[in-house]
Curated annotation (Swiss-Prot):
Lineage: Eukaryota, Viridiplantae, Streptophyta, Embryophyta, Tracheophyta
Tissue: Expressed in roots, leaf blades, leaf sheaths, shoot apex, flowers and panicles.
Protein source organism: Oryza sativa subsp. japonica
Modified residues (Phosphohistidine): 401
Protein name: Probable histidine kinase 2
Job of this protein: Cytokinin receptor related to bacterial two-component regulators. Functions as a histidine kinase and transmits the stress signal to a downstream MAPK cascade.
Alphabetically ordered keywords of this record: Cell membrane, Cytokinin signaling pathway, Kinase, Membrane, Phosphoprotein, Transferase, Transmembrane, Transmembrane helix, Two-component regulatory system
Transmembrane segments: 17-37, 337-357
Record-linked SUPFAM superfamilies: ATPase domain of HSP90 chaperone/DNA topoisomerase II/histidine kinase, CheY-like, Homodimeric domain of signal transducing histidine kinase
Length: 1048
C-alpha cells in the first residue's frame, strides 16, 4: 500500500510539471515566431523590391523588342530609295511597283508603302481594313485624279478595272518637306491614305536627284498593342504610352504630354496614376538602342514607376510602367500583427488554463483515491466473472454434448421404427423427425450466435429447390398452428418462386431464417393466421420471373441516410459490393411473414434484432432468433425490417430479401428435329406453373375452411382460367353443383384451348418432345368440373351425402373430386374417402407440390376422353394416390418418404463394421440401423476396447494371410467422447497398429459437437470423415461409400 502512495505522489508531481510545461512551450514558440516574422519581413521587402524592378525592366524590354517593325520599315524605305536612284528609273511606275510590293509583302505590319513624284503623281500599296486585309493599289495622276485597283496577291500586278477614289488633300509632312526641300529622310505622324482617321507613323526617304520620295506607314496602335499583348497576364501592372511629333519641322520634338498617354492593357488610366506622370522625368534613347529605365518611388507605399522614351527620327514615343503593389503585402503585414496578438492571447489563455487545471488536479487527487479503491474491487469482480464465464462455457459444452446424444437417440428410434410403421404412423414419425431437427436447430442457434459475433460463419453452397424449403418450413409451423387453431399457409402470390430453377446457397441457414420468423409469428399469435408470402425477381431480366423488386426503396433509403447522416453504416458497409447484383444467373427473393398477433410497438422495433432482447417477457425463447436472422440475411446480401401494416390491421409483418444464384442447369430449348431429351421433374413443374388460362371453361366448386386458404385457392383457380363457385356451407354443396352444371353451357367452347394449342404455346420444346408430357397432355375435353371439399373440421357424413350428386355427374361431365385433410384426419376417414370415390387427397396447408399434384390431376382429366384418370385407377385408393404423386410430384414423394433410395435395399450388404459407442441407447439404434442396411456389426463400449478388438482382428488376419494383410474391418464408426479412452486417442493407436502392416482402415468420427475445432482435431489424429449426431441412414450410406471409394 505504501508503494501505491509513493507512486501516487510521483504521479501528482508529474501532473504539475505537465501543467506548467505547455506555458513554457508557448512562451518559447512566441519568441521564435516574432524573430522569424521580423527577419522574413525584411527579407521579403528586399526581394519584392528586386522583383519589382526586374518585372518593370522585363516589361519595357518586351515592348522595345516589339518595336522592330518600325526599324524594318525605315530600312526598307531607304533601300528602295537607293535602288531607284542607282537605276535612274524614277518615273516608271512599272519599275517602282514591284520593288514597293516586295517590301510591302514581307512586312505584314506595314499599313501602306508609297512613292510620290515631284509632278504630283503617286503610287501606293495598302491593306484594306488593316492587319491581314486585302492588298490593293492606289495611284494618282499628275492632274490630281486618284484611282484604286485590286492587285494580284502573289505578284502585285494590278488586276481588274481601276475605280476612282476620293482625292487626298495633302501628303504627309515629311514627304512634302522631302519633295520641296530635299534632305536625308525623317518621320512624321499623319493619317494614312487608305485608312482615314488612323494615326500612322510615316518613315520617308528621298530618291536621289530630286525625283521623288519613298515612304512607309505603320499604324502606331497596331505595333504597340501587339507588343503589349504578352503582358496581359501580369497582375497589378499598368502600361501607358503616348506619341508626339514635330509636325515635319527640323527642331527636336517635345516630350508627350501626361494627358496624351493611353493604356496598353485595356484597363484605362486611373486618374491618380495619370496625375503622377507630370512628376516623372525620363531620358530619351534611340529606338535601336537599349531602353534607359528610370525607376521612381513616387507614392512608394502604393506604386512603383518606370519610364522610357524612344526618339524615332523626330517622333518621340513615351512609355510609362506602373506596378501597383500587391494587396498581399499589406495582408502579410497585418497578418504578422495579428499573429503576434494571437500568440499573446494564447499565452494568456494558457496561463489561465494552467491555473484552472492546477485547481482541478487537486480535486482529481481525491477522486483518484476513491476510484483506486473501486478499481481494486471491480478488478476482483472481473476475475470472478471471467472464471464463471469459463466454467459456464465448459458446462455448456458438456450439456451440448449430452443434449445432442439424447436427440440422436430420439432420431435413431424414429429412423428404426419407420420401416415397421403403417402410413398413419409414418406421418407422425415424419413430424417427430422435424421436431427433433427443430430442437437441434435451437441448440445450433446458440452456437451460431457465438460464431456470428466472432465473424466465423461461412455460408455453404449447395443446390436446393426454394419451393421445397418454403413448403417444409410452413408444414412444420402448421403442426403448431393446428394445435392453436391458427391458419398457416404459404401464399405463392404470382407463383414466381415456383417458376425458378434450383438455387445454390446455404439452405440450412436460409431455413433457419424462415423457421425463426414463422416460430415467432406462431408464438405471439393466438387467433387468425400466419402467412408466408414469396416473390422472385431476376435483377437482370431474362426469364419469365418478372415480379418487381419490393426492397429497392429500402436500399435507396439506406443510401440516403448513410450519405448525409452516416446512418445505417453497417448495412452499407456489408452490402456495398455484392457480385450477385450484376450476375445474370442471380435471383432476388423477397419474403414477407405476416401474422395477426399482438404486434410489436414502434419504440421497440429497432431493438428486436439485438441478441438476448425480447419484445415481451413471459413468452419463452432465448432472444437470439431475430439477431441471428438479421446476421444471416445480411450474409446473403439482403436486409430485413418490419413493414408497416394497413391502419386497423393487427399483427406484424417482417419483410426481407436475399440474393442467391441459380444452378444454371436449365438447358436451352432444342429443335424438334433433334429428338426428345431428358427432362427433370423440376422442369415439368416449372413449365406447368408458367401456363395461364389453360383450364378455360372449367368450373370449380370450392368449400374450404380458412379465409387465407380460400383466397389463395380462388386466386390460383381463376389464374388458370377456371370459374370458381364459393360454397358458404356444407348444406349448399348440392345446390352449388347444380348451378355450376347448368351454367357451364354458357361458356364459349371456341374460346377454350385445344390440346395442340396448349402444348405448342405454353410448354418449351424439350417438354413437348418428352414422352411423359406427350402421354399426359393428349386430346382435351374443353369443359370439366372440379369439386374441392375441406373435411378437416369434420362433418364428413354431411359431406358424403352432398357429394353423391357429384358422383352421379361423372358419367355426363369430366369431373374430379378432391378432399382437403390435415394432421388430425384419422385412418378410418381415409377409408371413407375411398368410398366417396375421392380422386385426390391433399393435406393442408395447400401449397407447392400439393398444388402441383392438383394441377396434374386436372391434366389427367384432359388427357382422357373419359372422366376416369389415365394414370390412376379407382379400384385401389392408396395405389391411386401414390402413383399420381410419384408421376407428377417426385419431389413431394421424396420428401415424405424419408427412406433411402438406392439401387439395392441393403447397400452395405456383407460389410464388416466396428461400431464404437458408449451410450447403450445409441448402440442399439445404430447397430439396428447398420444391420438393416446389410452390415455385420461388432460393438465396442469405449476406445480401449476398440483398440484391443482391432489389434486381435488384425493379428488373426495376418496369420491367415501369407502375402498381404486384409482389412480387419471395412469401416469403423468411432464416437469421439467416451470414458477411459476417447475416440481421438483410440484412432491414434489404431493408426499406429496399421503402420506395422501397411494398411489403412476408413474411420468415421461420430460426435455431438459441431465446432470447427473438433473437425480439425479429428483430421489431425487420422480420421477420414466427421459426422455430427444424430446420424441418418442416408448419411451413413453416403459416408461409407465416400470413404470406401476414396480408399479404392
Amino acid at each position: 500500500m505504501r508503494e501505491v502512495e509513493e507512486v501516487s505522489k510521483w504521479r501528482r508531481r508529474c501532473c504539475y510539471f505537465w501543467i506548467l510545461f505547455p506555458l513554457a512551450v508557448i512562451a518559447t514558440c512566441m519568441t521564435i515566431t516574432v524573430v522569424t516574422f521580423c527577419s522574413s519581413t525584411m527579407y521579403m521587402t528586399e526581394v519584392m523590391g528586386e522583383a519589382t524592378k526586374g518585372a518593370m525592366d522585363s516589361a519595357l524590354m518586351h515592348i522595345a523588342g516589339n518595336m522592330r517593325p518600325l526599324l524594318e520599315a525605315n530600312r526598307s524605305v531607304f533601300t528602295i530609295a537607293n535602288t531607284l536612284h542607282v537605276q535612274g528609273n524614277m518615273a516608271s511606275f512599272s519599275h517602282v511597283g514591284p520593288k514597293l510590293f516586295l517590301a510591302f509583302s514581307m512586312q505584314p505590319l506595314q499599313a501602306q508603302i508609297s512613292y510620290a513624284a515631284v509632278d504630283g503623281a503617286a503610287f501606293a500599296y495598302y491593306r484594306a481594313g488593316g492587319g491581314d486585309g486585302e492588298a490593293r493599289a492606289m495611284f494618282a495622276r499628275p492632274n490630281g485624279t486618284w484611282f484604286t485597283q485590286a492587285v494580284d496577291p502573289a505578284t502585285g500586278r494590278p488586276v481588274g478595272n481601276a475605280t476612282a477614289a476620293a482625292p487626298h488633300q495633302q501628303l504627309p509632312p515629311n514627304v512634302t518637306r522631302l519633295l520641296l526641300d530635299g534632305g536625308g529622310g525623317g518621320a512624321s505622324l499623319a493619317d494614312g491614305w487608305a485608312r482615314p482617321g488612323v494615326r500612322m507613323l510615316f518613315l520617308s526617304a528621298p530618291v536621289g536627284g530630286g525625283g521623288g520620295a519613298v515612304s512607309a506607314a505603320v499604324a502606331v496602335d497596331d505595333v504597340v498593342l501587339r507588343g503589349a499583348a504578352g503582358l496581359r497576364q501580369l497582375r497589378d501592372l499598368g502600361m501607358y504610352y503616348a506619341v508626339a511629333g514635330n509636325g515635319g519641322a527640323t527642331a527636336a520634338p517635345p516630350a508627350p504630354e501626361p494627358a496624351a498617354y493611353r493604356s496598353l492593357l485595356g484597363d484605362g488610366a486611373a486618374a491618380e496614376e495619370m496625375a503622377l506622370f507630370s512628376s516623372v522625368k525620363c531620358t530619351a534613347s534611340a529606338i535601336d538602342a537599349p531602353p534607359k529605365l528610370d525607376v521612381h518611388g513616387v507614392k512608394s507605399d502604393k506604386y512603383r514607376f518606370a519610364c522610357t522614351n524612344f526618339d524615332i527620327s523626330g517622333v518621340q514615343m513615351g512609355f510609362r510602367v506602373v506596378l501597383r503593389k500587391s494587396a498581399m503585402v499589406g495582408v502579410f503585414r497585418r497578418g504578422g500583427v495579428t499573429m503576434v496578438a494571437v500568440a499573446c492571447a494564447a499565452a494568456a489563455a494558457a496561463t489561465v488554463a494552467c491555473v484552472l487545471m492546477a485547481r482541478a488536479l487537486r480535486r482529481a487527487v481525491a477522486r483518484e483515491a476513491a476510484l483506486g479503491a473501486d478499481l481494486a474491487r471491480h478488478r476482483d469482480a472481473l476475475r470472478q466473472a471471467e472464471r464463471k464465464s469459463m466454467n459456464k462455457s465448459n458446462a455448456f459444452a458438456s450439456a451440448s454434448h449430452d443434449i445432442r446424444s439424447a436427440l440422436a437417440a430420439v432420431a435413431g428410434l424414429v429412423e428404426v421404427s419407420r420401416p415397421e410403421a403403417n402410413p398413419n404412423i409414418v406421418d407422425n414419425l415424419n413430424q417427430m423427425e422435424l421436431c427433433t431437427n427443430k430442437l437441434l436447430d435451437i441448440l445450433n442457434s446458440i452456437l451460431d450466435t457465438t460464431k456470428v459475433e466472432s465473424g466465423k460463419v461461412q455460408l455453404e453452397e449447395v443446390e436446393f429447390n426454394m419451393a421445397d424449403v418454403l413448403e417444409e418450413s410452413v408444414d412444420m409451423a402448421n403442426v403448431v398452428g393446428i394445435t392453436k387453431g391458427i391458419e398457416v399457409i404459404w401464399d405463392p402470390c404470382d407463383f414466381s418462386v415456383m417458376k425458378c430453377d434450383n438455387i445454390i446457397g446455404d439452405s440450412k441457414r436460409f431455413k433457419q431464417i424462415l423457421d425463426n420468423l414463422l416460430g415467432n409469428a406462431m408464438k405471439f399469435t393466438q387467433e387468425g393466421h400466419v402467412i408466408l408470402r414469396a416473390w422472385a425477381n431476376r435483377p437482370i431480366a431474362r426469364g419469365s420471373i418478372g415480379a418487381p423488386s419490393r426492397f429497392a426503396y429500402r436500399s435507396l433509403e439506406n443510401n440516403f441516410f448513410s450519405f448525409f447522416f452516416g446512418a445505417k453504416e453497417d448495412r452499407v458497409s456489408q452490402n456495398s459490393f455484392n457480385p450477385l447484383q450484376n450476375d445474370p444467373n442471380s435471383v432476388e427473393f423477397y419474403f414477407e411473414v405476416v401474422d395477426t398477433g399482438i404486434g410489436i410497438p414502434k419504440e421497440k422495433r429497432e431493438s428486436v434484432f439485438e441478441n438476448y432482447v425480447q419484445v415481451k417477457e413471459g413468452h419463452g425463447g432465448t432472444g437470439l432468433g431475430l439477431g441471428i436472422v438479421q446476421s444471416f440475411v445480411r450474409l446473403m446480401g439482403g436486409e430485413i425490417s418490419i413493414k408497416e401494416k394497413e391502419p386497423g390491421e393487427r399483427g406484424t409483418c417482417f419483410g426481407f430479401n436475399v440474393l442467391l444464384k441459380t444452378s444454371g442447369n436449365q438447358a436451352a430449348e432444342e429443335d424438334i428435329e433433334e429428338g426428345p431429351s431428358t427432362v427433370s421433374e423440376l422442369d415439368i413443374r416449372a413449365s406447368v406453373f408458367r401456363e395461364t388460362n389453360c383450364f378455360k371453361g372449367w368450373h370449380c366448386i370450392l368449400f374450404v375452411h380458412g379465409d387465407e386458404t380460400r383466397r389463395v385457392l380462388q386466386a390460383w383457380m381463376e389464374s388458370i382460367g377456371m370459374k370458381v363457385w364459393m360454397v358458404p356451407g356444407v348444406e349448399s354443396i348440392s345446390s352449388t353443383l347444380e348451378k355450376a352444371r347448368s351454367s357451364r353451357d354458357d361458356c364459349d367452347v371456341d374460346r377454350c384451348f385445344s390440346s395442340k394449342e396448349m402444348v405448342s404455346q405454353v410448354l418449351p420444346t424439350t417438354l413437348r418432345n418428352n414422352n411423359i408430357m406427350a402421354r399426359n397432355l393428349g386430346e382435351h375435353h374443353p369443359l370439366g368440373m372440379l369439386l374441392i371439399v375441406d373435411v378437416s373440421n369434420g362433418q364428413l357424413e354431411n359431406i358424403q351425402r352432398q357429394a353423391r350428386d357429384f358422383t352421379q355427374m361423372r358419367s355426363q361431365v369430366p369431373c374430379k373430386f378432391v378432399c382437403l385433410t390435415d394432421l388430425r384426419t384419422s385412418y378410418k376417414d381415409f377409408r371413407r374417402f375411398e368410398e366417396m370415390s375421392c380422386d385426390l387427397i391433399l393435406r393442408k396447408p395447400v401449397h407447392g407440390s400439393r398444388l402441383y399434384s392438383l394441377l396434374m390431376t386436372l391434366r389427367d382429366v384432359q388427357s382422357s376422353p373419359m372422366h376416369r384418370s389415365s394414370l390412376v385407377g379407382h379400384e385401389n385408393y392408396v395405389t391411386r394416390h401414390q402413383d399420381s404423386a410419384n408421376i407428377v410430384a417426385l419431389a413431394e414423394v421424396g420428401r415424405l418418404d424419408q427412406g433411402l433410395k438406392t439401387e439395392e435395399d441393403r447397400p452395405l450388404d456383407g460389410m464388416h463394421v466396428l461400431l464404437v459407442e458408449d451410450t447403450l441407447v445409441l448402440q442399439t439404434i445404430q447397430r439396428k440401423m447398420l444391420n438393416q442396411l446389410g452390415a455385420i456389426v461388432e460393438l465396442a463400449g469405449d476406445g480401449a476396447k476398440a483398440v484391443d478388438m482391432f489389434r486381435d482382428a488384425i493379428e488373426r488376419a495376418s496369420v491367415s494371410e501369407e502375402h498381404s494383410v486384409p482389412l480387419p474391418y471395412d469401416v469403423i464408426f468411432m464416437d469421439c467422447q467416451m470414458p477411459r479412452m476417447d475416440g481421438y486417442e483410440a484412432t491414434r493407436r489404431i493408426r499406429e497398429e496399421e503402420s506395422r502392416y501397411g494398411i489403412r482402415t476408413p474411420i468415421i468420427a461420430l460426435t455431438a459437437h459441431s465446432m470447427e475445432d473438433d473437425l480439425q482435431k479429428a483430421i489431425d489424429v487420422g480420421m477420414d470423415l466427421h459426422m455430427t449426431k444424430p446420424i441418418e441412414r442416408r448419411r451413413i450410406v453416403e459416408a461409407v461409400h465416400g470413404v470406401c471409394k476414396g480408399k479404392n
